[in-house]
Swiss-Prot record:
Catalyzes the cleavage of 5-oxoproline to form L-glutamate coupled to the hydrolysis of ATP to ADP and inorganic phosphate. It comes from Caldanaerobacter subterraneus subsp. tengcongensis (strain DSM 15242 / JCM 11007 / NBRC 100824 / MB4). This is 5-oxoprolinase subunit A. One of its GO terms (biological process) is carbohydrate metabolic process. InterPro entries: Glyco_hydro/deAcase_b/a-brl, LamB/YcsF/PxpA-like. It is an enzyme of class 3 (hydrolase). PANTHER family: 5-OXOPROLINASE SUBUNIT A, UNCHARACTERIZED PROTEIN YBGL-RELATED. It catalyses: 5-oxo-L-proline + ATP + 2 H2O = L-glutamate + ADP + phosphate + H(+). Transmembrane segments: none annotated. Belongs to the LamB/PxpA family.
C-alpha cells in the first residue's frame, strides 16, 4: 500500500497583490503551507486561507520565512540563531491563533525559500528552526528533505519529520534542489512531472539534473502555488497517483 501527502505553498498574496491560484489549488492538495506575513501574506490573507483550507478539508501548516517581502524570502539573510528562532516562533504563533479561534490546530511547519535551503545545509540554522517548533508545540511535524541538517535537527529535538520531494523542481546529484537561477531548475512538463513523482513514491528514486539516479524518501510532495501551472500540476499529479493505487492523505495521518 502506498500513501503520500500533497502540499502547496499558499496564502502568499498581501495587500493589493494577488499571488497564486489558492482557491483552485486547495481542491487537489491534502496539506497547505500558509505564509505568515514575513516573506508574504498578511492578516487578512492568513484568515481567508485558513478558512479556505477548512472548507476543502486541507490540513494546515505554517510556512515561516525571512522578513523579506521584496525578495519573497528567497534571498539569504545574515541572521543569528536567536533571531531565526524568534522569527519562526513569531510566525507559527500568528497562524496558530487564526487556527485556534476556528477550533483547529496546525499540523506542520515548513520553512520557506532561502530559510528552507539554508536549513538543509547549515546545522545552526536547522537547530534554531527545530528548537522554535518544539518550543511552541512538540506535536508539530517538521517538513524538509532527506539527509539534510534539518532532518538531523528535528531528530535531535524529538520532532516528527516528514520527508519532502518537489514535483516541479529538478535536483542535484547530492539530492539538493537545483538553484532557481539555473535555466532548468523548474520542470514545466506535466507528463514528466507526473512520471517523476510516481517513480519517487513507488521506487524511491529520482533522476537528477545530470541523469544520475538519486535515492529519495517521500512522505509529502510539494507543488508550488506561485507557479502559473500549479493548478493543473496538482490536479494531474493527484490523478496520476490515485490511478496508480496511491492514497492521498494529510501527513499527520501517517508520519
Amino acid at each position: 500500500m502506498y500513501r503520500v501527502d500533497i502540499n502547496s505553498d499558499i496564502g502568499e498574496s498581501f495587500g493589493a497583490y494577488k499571488i497564486g491560484m489558492d482557491e483552485e489549488v486547495v481542491k487537489y492538495i491534502s496539506s497547505a503551507n500558509i505564509a505568515c506575513g514575513f516573506h508574504a501574506g498578511d492578516p487578512m490573507v492568513m484568515a481567508l486561507t485558513v478558512d479556505r483550507c477548512l472548507k476543502n478539508v486541507v490540513s494546515i501548516g505554517a510556512h515561516p520565512g525571512f522578513p523579506d517581502l521584496l525578495g519573497f524570502g528567497r534571498r539569504n539573510l545574515d541572521a543569528s540563531s536567536e533571531e531565526i528562532k524568534n522569527y519562526v516562533i513569531y510566525q507559527i504563533g500568528a497562524l496558530q491563533a487564526f487556527a485556534a479561534i476556528r477550533g483547529t490546530k496546525l499540523q506542520h511547519v515548513k520553512a520557506h525559500g532561502a530559510l528552507y535551503n539554508m536549513a538543509a545545509v547549515d546545522e545552526k540554522i536547522a537547530m534554531a528552526i527545530a528548537e522554535a517548533i518544539a518550543s511552541v508545540d512538540r506535536n508539530l511535524i517538521c517538513v524538509g528533505m532527506a539527509n539534510t541538517a534539518m532532518e538531523r535537527a528535528a531528530e535531535k529535538v524529538g520532532l516528527r519529520f516528514a520527508y519532502e520531494v518537489f514535483a516541479d523542481r529538478n535536483i542535484n546529484p547530492d539530492g539538493t534542489l537545483v538553484s532557481r537561477k539555473h535555466p532548468n531548475a523548474i520542470i514545466h512538463d506535466e507528463e514528466l512531472a507526473c512520471k517523476r513523482v510516481l517513480r519517487m513514491v513507488k521506487e524511491g528514486v529520482c533522476e537528477a539534473i545530470d541523469g544520475t539516479l538519486v535515492k529519495v524518501k517521500v512522505d509529502t510532495i510539494c507543488v508550488h502555488g506561485d507557479n502559473p501551472q500549479a493548478v493543473e500540476f496538482a490536479k494531474k499529479i493527484r490523478e496520476t497517483l490515485e490511478e496508480n493505487g496511491v492514497d492521498i492523505l494529510p501527513m499527520g495521518e501517517f508520519v
